[in-house]
């Protein structure tokens, strides 16, 4: 799929496969591209391979797809230049105690939450349609949480590598209730219980 001609819609594939192929169990996907392109800017290039969609879309795939042997699809040089994203990817477990599909529609978008011990990882992606998604985290018990979130940057619709990282502590997890996803976009979040 990734090396096929430009007419292939990788974003639609990404928001379809979790609903169909994942029913059979874990799969290999090889996500994690650091060279990201908008629909307009993408082209197959052997010497400078890139992914369709935003950087946060790529990060979110680590939560959305169940793969106990995750890979990195890009050059080590690119990961060395993108330490913030690389460290986040390295922190994501490959085995889970619990999985919840929070919301989604086949071929449109999906939001998945996965728990490893007491830490939750939440990822959401969309097809080429930008959208505001509601994030229902009401399944989490009341308490104080430390949140790390990567979300599409304000210019991600023009520059797919643009993202914003936020880090904060909250006592009201429901405050994170709406996120904007750029075309081909996504978000990736780590939620840890927090004791002062």
Regions found by a protein language model. Give the residues of each.
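Glycan-recognition surfaces
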Residues: 1-76, 102
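Conserved, mostly hydrophobic/aromatic
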Residues: 64, 122, 184
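Extended hydrophobic-aromatic, low-complexity segments
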Residues: 73, 123-124, 131-135, 145-148, ...
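Glycan-recognition and catalytic regions of carbohydrate-active enzymes
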Residues: 74-121, 157-161
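Active/binding-pocket-proximal capping segment
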Residues: 79-85, 128-131, 138-155
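Carbohydrate-binding surface patches
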Residues: 106-142, 187-188
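Solvent-exposed beta-strand/loop surfaces of large extracellular or lumenal domains
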Residues: 149-174
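C-terminal beta-strand-rich structural cap/linker in extracellular carbohydrate-active enzymes
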Residues: 166-196
């Amino acid at each position: 799929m990734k090396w096929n001609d430009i007419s292939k819609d990788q974003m639609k594939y990404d928001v379809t496969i979790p609903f169909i192929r994942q029913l059979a169990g874990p799969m290999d996907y090889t996500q994690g591209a650091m060279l990201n392109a908008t629909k307009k800017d993408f082209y197959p290039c052997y010497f400078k391979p890139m992914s369709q969609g935003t950087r946060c879309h790529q990060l979110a795939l680590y939560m959305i797809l169940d793969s106990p042997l995750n890979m990195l699809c890009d050059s080590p040089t690119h990961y060395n230049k993108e330490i913030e994203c690389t460290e986040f990817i390295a922190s994501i477990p490959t085995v889970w105690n619990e999985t919840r599909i929070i919301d989604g529609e086949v071929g449109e978008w999906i939001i998945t939450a996965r728990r490893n011990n007491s830490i939750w990882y939440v990822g959401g992606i969309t097809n080429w349609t930008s959208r505001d998604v509601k994030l229902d985290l009401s399944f989490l018990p009341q308490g104080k949480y430390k949140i790390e979130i990567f979300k599409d940057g304000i210019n991600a619709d023009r520059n797919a590598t643009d993202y914003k990282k936020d880090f904060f502590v909250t006592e009201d997890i429901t405050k994170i209730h709406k996120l904007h996803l750029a075309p081909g976009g996504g978000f990736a979040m780590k939620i840890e219980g927090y004791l002062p």
